[in-house]
A protein has these predicted regions:
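Binuclear metal-dependent phosphoesterase catalytic core
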Residues: 295-377, 394-397, 402-408, 417
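Extended active-site neighborhood of metal-dependent phosphoesterases/phosphodiesterases
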Residues: 90-96, 103-105, 170-262, 278-286, ...
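N-terminal active-site segment of His-dependent metallophosphoesterases
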Residues: 27-32, 40, 88-90, 95-172
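A short, solvent-exposed beta-strand micro-motif common in secreted/extracellular proteins
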Residues: 62-64, 79-94, 568
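Extracytoplasmic beta-rich repeat domains
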Residues: 425-445, 453-461, 476-489, 516-535, ...
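Short, ordered, surface-exposed loop/turn motifs in non-cytosolic proteins
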Residues: 30-33, 38-62, 368-372
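Short loop/turn segments that connect beta-strands within beta-propeller blades
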Residues: 468-471, 508-512, 551-555, 594-598, ...
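Short, acidic Ser/Thr/Gly-rich low-complexity loop/linker segments typical of extracellular
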Residues: 44-46, 52, 59-72, 76, ...
Length: 773
């Protein structure tokens, strides 16, 4: 969780005296020695015949020494040392702890000559799981699912990059997810909320890392696995001041790098994207972090790939889905990743159109290894896997369209699941894109339906697509540099898009050729997730420090935001009314500017506006949007609040309110779909959908009934998607259920209705066309 209010990571460390010791250490002379040995019987102690291991790296966190030919080492400890650690070599595991706690010895200026570390050979797999910001303090179902995942997947370790969260969380996870009960090494890094106030070391220095060290051992160390060297580093600032400085960590990294072969691939861990810690003299391939509550893959100018991930337990601030990241690598440091989305479990939903069956086949913990269609009479048709979520088969031509069939799937955990075909309601066509789709609302113009995709895993298949509105055929695709999560804009025959790396594109809507592209200013938050808005020859992109207006024809910057409000993220799409541009900065507030000049007009920073993520609706010269627990109408130019209703729900969704028939319709994070009376803002009705199969609304994690989708009106009904994997149709006046379409995965976009045809996308990258009559 980011609560640093966007201060530079290093401001707290600029004073030369911050880390000066409070006691005289000139007489300090603690020495530590011992042996690193091959523990043949793996009992955690050195027995007769078990020999020492030469050239093993041992460190006190400041300097590094190597064992001699007999496996013995001796180190003169730094006065601020806390642990003596052996850096686990490739192909080995520790049979006792990889560190020895020397804090009491340091305080007493004692020496210790009996530090023994056992190592045993083990298999390595070139793979690990990554999660971050787990922030729980009680045992929940997702921990059991993580143990299932660990039992099924052969991996070298599991990395948790910080914000285990506060003393209660640290102590809980030091027991709940250990090497022993997870069946592999657990690598924890310290986050800003893991630095706990109220502690001093034996020299009187602030000691924010004390509780973390009590629970997990050293906050920085390294190890090697599957040909790659891994460096674990600590968060540099946080809720309490640590005893270490950035210079301490940088100096230790240089010491550490002396112990590995030149050119060996290196990956680094930290709670944040601490680019200042990346050494220039090393072959750093990846930096793994959390903190920003995002699912992001991005490559810097230096060539280092940064991977951010949240947790499988909950959704994150930028509405990134609840997931862990599986990272696979080889000895050259080449990396591929895959997201495992939760809490979806043993899940099959099948559709058939024009003789082709496509099925969602997915389980968060295990992998589908086989899927097949079971026809009437028991005949089976093998399915092929299109992506990590979708399987496909072509049915025999002789089958009647109304035939009933089942889909069977087998998973690596031994489970076999069978599901009956969904009875289709007017499915005209269905197209599976080579990437996933997120909040991007489909746009139709002429013969084309435009959508955009994301690839948070490897950024290989990110593109804008033009599909034939009648058949779903992909007429063209335009590759972009990274994921597009927000809305496209269409104006004067040009599609405008923005990817998560802050690149804005103008694309010819007829042939998919890029007319211009431009990189806009990055902000403190690393990911551009908001939608693009275009009108009157201008393209509006970004939020906070990246907010700008571009000339739609040339991409030239017309103005940039000079009112540098902060922001964690923004997933809504900016809107204009009466010449005013309304934008959003999650955790900070709503901000409004003159659309022509960029002049700052007004801001709202109360709690309802701070925790607001909905795209605003425009009604005449006003904006209507949701706050954390409220729906508001404000005058566009002045910001005057004209109406406000507060409700016992959380509106932490992207859902854009629909104003229709004297009502406001909108989705909630936790309680389904809501209709309120526009005249007095009183609740008209509330419809409860099913619990989310994948969480996307920030901090949802406990079977919340989430609707991120924006509603559309159709006759006297309202249609919207939901995170439970359904598209719903309800009566506007009373919320009476009319019908629902079972898609199987979250529908996050705003459905589109054109000529009595309903278009929408799902999380897996399926595009659907249904006839409404």
């Amino acid at each position: 969780m980011i609560r640093l209010f966007f201060t530079s990571l290093f401001v707290l460390f600029t004073s030369a005296g911050v880390y000066s010791q409070q006691a005289d250490t000139q007489q300090f002379n603690s020495k530590f020695s011992g042996i690193v040995y091959c523990d043949g019987n793996e009992n955690g102690r050195q027995d007769r015949g078990e020999k020492g291991m030469a050239d093993m790296a041992v460190s006190d966190g400041f300097s590094v020494v190597m064992t001699d030919r007999s496996g013995r080492f001796s180190i003169d400890a730094n006065p601020r040392a806390r642990f003596i650690s052996v850096y686990t070599p490739d192909g080995y595991r520790n049979t006792n702890r990889f560190f020895s706690d020397i804090r009491n010895d340091i305080a007493a200026n004692n020496s210790n000559t009996g530090l023994d570390f056992g190592l045993a050979e083990c298999e390595t797999y070139g793979s690990f799981a990554h999660m971050s910001d787990i922030e729980d303090r009680i045992y929940m179902d997702w921990i059991d699912r993580m143990k299932e995942y660990a039992a099924i997947h052969n991996q070298d370790f599991i990395a948790v990059t910080g914000d285990i969260c506060y003393e209660t969380g640290l102590r809980f996870f030091s027991q709940a997810m250990t090497d022993a009960n997870m069946g592999r090494r657990m690598v924890y890094t310290i986050g800003n909320h893991d630095l706990i106030k109220g502690h001093k070391d034996c020299w009187g220095n602030d000691y924010g890392e004390k509780i973390f060290e009590d629970c997990f051992g050293p906050a920085w160390y390294s190890f090697t696995s599957s040909g790659v060297h891994f460096i674990v580093t600590p968060m540099l600032t946080g809720d309490a001041k640590p005893s270490y400085s950035p210079d301490d960590i940088k100096a230790w990294i240089q010491e550490d790098l002396r112990t590995i072969p030149q050119g060996m691939p290196v990956m680094m861990f930290n709670h944040d994207a601490a680019e200042s810690l990346v050494p220039e003299n090393a072959n750093v391939k990846a930096f793994i972090y959390g903190h920003r509550h995002d699912d992001l893959r991005s490559v810097t100018d230096s060539g280092v790939t940064y991977f951010c991930c949240m947790s499988p337990s909950k959704a994150s601030n930028d509405h990134a889905a609840s997931a862990l990241r599986e990272i696979t690598f080889n000895r050259q440091g080449e990396i591929t990743t895959r997201m495992h989305y939760a809490p979806i479990s043993n899940h099959i939903v099948a559709h058939e159109v024009n003789g082709i069956v496509r099925a969602v086949v997915y389980d968060a913990a295990s992998e589908p290894v086989k899927a097949e269609v079971i026809l009437q009479g028991g005949r089976k048709v093998a399915m092929r896997q299109l992506n990590d979520m979708i399987w496909e088969a072509r049915l025999p031509q002789a089958m009647a369209p109304e035939s009933v069939y089942k889909v069977s799937a087998e998973f690596t955990d031994g489970e076999r699941i069978i599901a009956r075909q969904q009875q289709e309601r007017g499915l005209k066509w269905m197209r599976t894109l080579p990437c996933k789709t997120y909040f991007c609302n489909p746009i139709a113009s002429g013969k084309y339906l435009y959508v955009a995709g994301m690839d948070n895993e490897n950024a290989r298949d990110c593109a804008v697509f033009a599909l034939n509105v009648q058949s779903g055929k992909i007429e063209w695709s335009c590759a972009v540099k990274n994921s597009i999560k927000g809305d496209l804009a269409l104006m004067d025959g040009v599609i405008y898009a923005g990817d998560v790396d802050y690149n804005v594109y103008a694309i010819n809507a007829e042939d998919g050729k890029i007319i211009w592209s431009k990189s806009v200013n990055k902000t403190f938050y690393p990911s551009f997730t908001e939608g693009i808005h275009a009108e009157n020859g201008r393209v509006f992109a970004g939020c906070a420090g990246s907010l700008c207006a571009l000339d739609a024809r040339t991409g030239e910057t017309l103005w940039t935001n000079s009112h540098k409000h902060g922001s964690i993220t923004n997933v809504c799409t900016n809107r204009t009314a009466n010449g005013a541009l309304l934008t959003n900065g999650y955790w900070v507030g709503r901000f409004c500017y003159d659309a022509a000049t960029g002049e700052f007009l007004w801001e709202k920073k109360d709690n309802d506006n701070r925790y607001s993520t909905s795209t605003p609706a425009v009604l005449d010269s006003t904006f209507i949007y949701t706050g954390y627990g409220a729906i508001m109408q404000v005058a566009a130019r002045s910001g005057q609040e004209l109406r406000k209703g507060s409700y016992p729900y959380i509106f932490n969704t992207r859902s854009e309110p629909l104003v229709c028939g004297g009502r406001i319709f909108v989705g909630t994070s936790n309680n389904g779909f809501l209709a309120v009376n526009f005249s007095d803002m009183s609740q008209a009705w509330n419809f409860l959908c099913e619990p989310a199969v994948i969480y996307t609304s920030p901090y949802t994690k406990n079977r919340e009934k989430t609707v991120e989708s924006s509603p559309v009106a159709y006759k006297d009904c309202v249609i919207f998607g939901a995170n439970d994997g359904y598209v719903y149709c309800l009566k506007q006046d009373n919320g009476l259920f009319q019908w629902r379409l079972k898609v199987g995965l979250p529908v996050l976009c705003k459905p589109l209705i054109v000529d009595k045809l309903l278009y929408f996308t799902d999380f897996a990258g399926n595009v659907y066309c249904y006839g409404l009559e």
